[in-house]
């Protein structure tokens, strides 16, 4: 194979590439597989060390890029993941979903830039076997919750099945509309040393990963557009379209215009992004239990002042948590009465409750017999041999070989890797198996192939597997062409399918072409048309959008005030004997008032002025990047990101690109640099990037979001927060009379912080007075930064809410604030009392500030009220209204 000219120029050709890859594979430099699944089949090169034809173009592309190019590729993929907000929360698989550690934060999704390439011939084998397996599991599910002939005929042992947590007694008698009971199926597979494929696990409870698979395709296709165009892998998007049609078709027969929702456990779910991204692709609302209610045997979604009927639920909540009435009583993730609604046939839940029984590891032992009995077919895809402890001969084999098997409990889900257990652990396990043999199975250790990975700019070898997906259609099962590939963890952890990174799976087309038209497979049209995507206005969603508006505005205002304070500090830190320098402690005190955290006391005296200027650098640092500092900039950004994650399906992709840049700018940093110049550079960058990001986000919201009730509630949050911030800032800076030079400096800084200095100078020709400032910042309805403007927008937004009467309590409260404001006059507000205070100004600002807080509280207690027992996703402490 001759290297390309560009590869030769780069000094990195295919021969060198292969030599490095062979060395890495032989020495196992990336993953130590000597105690793990072994090298086995190599996807990339054949037994003679030559690149397989399926991978030729990729080998050329990697060789052409060289080490520097591979490094850049990793960086590009990381940036794309960051920009798209693709996350994953790594949690203990046995974590209680009800009492999980909410301190766990989602981390960035790890994706290997190099795809796993599958030939057209291999895909034909996989597709046929996968579809057959879905058909078989569907037949088993229908039998187990129907006639149970496989039990009565002795093919399946009841003691193994009914003790499995996936069996749901309350699901007996539930029948999905149509011919299929298993709606969606995911299957983990690997390749054996002889090149054939083997199934390692089936996922039927609430299969995850299809959203990640399609997100991975988007990222990798953008990262290597030239290679994507050259290889022209078959697209994954038809699967999303097929899934959408299938969900609509799954509605009860009486539903003429079906409404479909995706039920999620919430943002703390391990695969929250997967759920939200899939909901976005499908065009269906992402909901949580708080959004739904069962009334009169029907499922409804809470909307502002009304209820909307729901016909189909794509369930991503495990079955036992789906209904606290009929299933797990302490669940906060389910909907009371959902099981009863299913029994009545008023709603379809997919995958159906009870489908998790198909994940029983003991079932693998009987699949060959079941395939012959139910399908009259031999399995096309096999699993590693399984031995069930309930059969004497197999129990003997299991006990004799426990140190070399994968041991699984059919009751607890516990999985033990025999080769990793000590003698004492093996002896204890043998006793447990002898005591209750029917609940244990032993499986031969799975084997995996290896494939190229991009590790630190070097082409390395690692064990790989893949998860493939199907969805039920009236005509059969439709697979995703491709799926979710993954790089296995080093050593024995691979046997339990522990992964360290994902891989996009590229299926080569049957006939090479530079482009392939993306179309939905030819399917029978759905029986129902399906409702269009309607605005989601449940209290939970509206609450999160309300707080998005508040946190976004809070971050913008905080960034601007921090910039002004930092700049004034550098101007006056060597001029502390001037009257103008008093603006620094005043601004510092304003920061303290706004954040509810005192920066100092007694600002204004010469001693205090010097003292506050001295501590300004450390205070500005903590107020910018310290996540534990109340009211800090990073805390506002984190609150914004958390609220956005909860309503991901409501937001555009551009939102995540902006948020990613802002989060990086203010991410947690260590102690400030010793050098003041270095610290200032860090702060300047963080504050400026946050301000730019918030302005961009405001533009995205204004120009890209539909101005529905959700947008209205977000704007309400924005207007309340801007009003709170403005009244707190003006009260902290203008209510006390100071030396004229100091007052001018303070007014200038305040106007800059309010983004109104340019218009002020143009109107007043540079003359500074408190009356002129209040005229502009309180009474000018044409100034989008003024208080009256916020009140007018707030009043209009409240009027636009569904069910508005024009005289609701929040509307009356805003009218009262407007009346009070319009009765005041700038000249009167400038008047000074005997104690040197502008008492009327201070009283007005304090009163409106308190009233705005009251409006927020009333909205939270009424339109945004969550059902009884529910808690805000970030807890009460962080949801307090600020400024104080």
Swiss-Prot record:
CC terms in the record's Gene Ontology section: plasma membrane
Record-linked InterPro entries: ATP-dep_Glu-Cys_Ligase-2 (IPR051680), CP_ATPgrasp (IPR007302), DUF403 (IPR007296)
Domain of life: Bacteria
Protein known as: Uncharacterized protein Rv2567
Biological source species: Mycobacterium tuberculosis (strain ATCC 25618 / H37Rv)
